[in-house]
């Protein structure tokens, strides 16, 4: 900052200017006063001397003696002229060599002096009268006198050189004093302005530090005046700012943590439609839309058209708006609420909820109800129909009655299995699966499973193979539950494998457990159905017959049993290539 633009420069210049103006006025007035004072003193002295001369001339009979006495009264700077008329006038000796000499001609040439001479009146005048030698400003005093009836005038002339010399010396001292005063004022003004502005500079530096976020900045308190109070208030302001900024940061961090931990997406939108704040779920939503629109994620700050229209409606109506939209195969519910700044809308906040799982569960629930209704209605209808046939004696022969009774028996068993499966699944999903761990010989266990299905495989012309590679023959698991797992998976593999196909069972020891693979060369499972294959009543083959369908609960039960053993199960499949179910059972510690 330039010196003249600084507070120091302005204060220094202001104080110095005021002092200079005051000194100038005082100097002018003082010089005028001193000069006038000296002139007035000289005039008074000269008037007294003129009166004394007039008295001497009036009181002495011997005028020549009186004049001699008068000449003695005059000093080197004073000249005396005694004039009775144009012919009778006398001058003090050596007047021609004096700067103050005066003649009748000079008096007659001056209007005021000539008038006083004619009227015999007192006169006092400051004037410059030219003679042959010099041009000098003088003080002339005229006093009338009268002797023996003869009137005359006594004129005293005195040069003002002495007065001017005195005034010059006085002026030098005054200017010297003024110069000293100016120098002292300069130093004093600079010192005062620097002392005043030092705390201000510190406050400026402190304000700059505050602007940079250094809220612990303190200003030194050097005085107890208004500037000291200002420094105290500044320090208090810094502490308050530090406190409030910390509180805001804590609230911001808390709000950020809340937003980040929310399962729902949150988007804060400015009044012009630009996005201000988002949380991770909302960012995933926007990224999915940017990807769908082939937009650069870094450059994208727009909303989907549906969300933008909802935002405009919320701002215009000042009411909450809600829509459901599908993006990248996922269902989203979008709730838009206006944000207010005092009395006007300043933007809106959008809450996004991923409803894909809910919609899937709704679909599964509907399918579950439909499947349960279907699975129960079919055997009940058959039981009712064949029972009516027996009651109405429609079966005429014993063979027909046995056939009807067998059908009723089979359907009742089927309905019982469905109910038992539902009860088992409900117990497993509620965490009440009771496992009875015991050491089982894996080879013997697997041989029993193979024998159980070998007849069915042979009947369907399907090759049933197995491969066992174990480090230990015995393993801890629930034999009944694990047999249920193998039964469900092998039964599914055989039912969905055509004649001439194959089903292989592989059991291998892995680190801390067993790895089992059940692979078939059947029809396979569509890729879009793989994520839901372990849901209750989910059927990948929607067109398969009841004979192949089973209850639709087998794989759900399998998954729950495996997970009850702290294991995991996966499935890999390709259409017309076959399916492989792989599950892992950890060693029981």
UniProtKB/Swiss-Prot annotation:
Residues 253-320 form the PAS domain. It catalyses: ATP + protein L-histidine = ADP + protein N-phospho-L-histidine. Its main location: membrane. One of its GO terms (biological process) is regulation of DNA-templated transcription. Residues 371-589 form the Histidine kinase domain. It comes from the Bacteria. GO terms for cellular component: membrane raft; plasma membrane. The keyword Transit peptide does not apply. It is a multi-pass membrane protein. It holds the Pfam family HisKA. Residues 194-246 form the HAMP domain. Residues 1-10, 194-589 are cytoplasmic. GO terms for molecular function: ATP binding; phosphorelay response regulator activity; phosphorelay sensor kinase activity; protein kinase activator activity. Residues 32-172 are extracellular. The chain crosses the membrane at residues 11-31, 173-193. The modification Phosphohistidine is found at residue 374. It is found in: Cell membrane; Membrane raft. Member of the two-component regulatory system ResD/ResE involved in the global regulation of aerobic and anaerobic respiration. Probably phosphorylates ResD. This is Sensor histidine kinase ResE. The gene is resE.
